Regions:
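Sec/Tat signal peptide C-region and signal peptidase I cleavage site
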Residues: 17-21
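Sec-dependent N-terminal signal peptides
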Residues: 5-15
Length: 327
């Protein structure tokens, strides 16, 4: 049996990832870009929605998880959809409201995502394409169904692994990775439903449905993807003519771990300037702020204050999002 003094940081990280199941990136600002957790949310807005973002989790912790991504989504044949939204190139000196959500008509949407997720010596790159169909249930409510297909590359970076203390004890998992046998490509399928109107939403999505059934590459190390479920919901409520509040939730589940529950409250001023707070059960308290910089650009920042056992080692987490709205 290995003693703590013989275990390297990378083995600790591997064990931690297996236990905590952080196989999928975590997004504090999920409420502002639900497309990243549900392909059914592709094309909700009638313009080309481009997002680039970066996230540093557990700042101050050596080899902490880092995530960066870019996404783009758009309805097909957008020119046939009439919208009051008409973004310009200039920066705005006044209030720029959120674009409207149009319901009551059939539409199709496509999108793509590129995600780079790294934690310690482990790196995951994934390129994904999505398609969604939006069905009008009534004039005010739509139900969309989205699918995704992606290719993920899971790599063990041998040069980033450092052994804390030498040991003669044989550990097959550790030996397999440090022999540079960790480069596997895995096909990923996902799907999701998204019910929405101008003021409310409810979604359910599943990711990594194929697990590791379809894989290829030069490695023999065992990357073991698990099916992930995401359930989201929220409703926008007016407080007065200038303020709205949106209570929302995100539930994440991966067998056999316990569900992760996140509750969020977003306060928005004239659909232009917003702030939000989230509580991630036994993990973090999150503060967020953002605004529409102009008719074309939007910005969001969040800070995670850890309340887990890692709070004494980490100064928190940071996430920055820049959105570009193209008409």
């Amino acid at each position: 049996m290995l003693k703590n003094k013989y275990i390297s940081f990378i083995v600790l990280l591997l064990m931690f990832c297996d236990v905590k199941a952080q196989q999928m990136p975590q997004y504090s600002q999920y409420l502002r870009n639900q497309y990243m957790i549900n392909p059914g949310a592709a094309g909700v807005y009638d313009f080309v929605d481009v997002t680039v973002a970066g996230r540093l989790q557990w700042a101050g912790f050596s080899e902490a998880p880092m995530t960066s991504y870019a996404s783009v989504t758009s309805p097909i044949l957008r020119g046939k959809n009439k919208s009051v939204y008409n973004p310009g190139l200039h920066m705005s000196s006044g209030i720029v409201k959120n674009p409207e959500i149009n319901t009551g008509k059939l539409k199709h949407a496509v999108g793509g995502q590129l995600v780079a997720d790294q934690y310690g010596a482990f790196r995951k790159l994934q390129l994904t394409g999505t398609y969604a169909i939006h069905l009008p249930l009534t004039k005010d409510y739509n139900l969309s169904f989205g699918t995704k297909i992606g290719l993920g590359n899971n790599t063990f970076l041998q040069d980033r692994a450092v052994v804390a203390n030498a040991t003669t004890v044989v550990d097959n998992t550790y030996t397999g990775f440090t022999n540079n046998q960790g480069n596997i490509n895995i096909l990923n399928l996902g799907a999701g439903f998204y019910f929405y109107s101008k003021t409310l939403f409810l979604g359910i999505a599943a990711d990594q449905l194929t697990k590791n059934f379809i894989k290829f590459g030069s490695g023999t190390a065992n990357f073991d993807p698990k099916i992930h479920m995401n359930v989201t919901g929220g409703i926008k409520l007016p407080l007065n003519e200038n303020l709205t509040i949106t209570p929302a939730f995100l539930v994440k589940y991966m067998n056999p771990t316990k569900p992760s529950i996140e509750a969020t409250a977003q306060l928005e001023y004239k659909e232009w300037l917003w702030t939000a707070f989230s509580y991630r059960h036994k993990d973090a308290v999150v503060g967020m702020v953002g605004m529409n910089i102009s008719n074309r650009f939007k910005f969001g920042y969040s800070y995670d204050f850890s309340i887990s056992q890692f709070r004494t080692y980490s100064s928190g987490g940071h996430e920055i999002i820049l959105g570009i709205m193209l008409r």
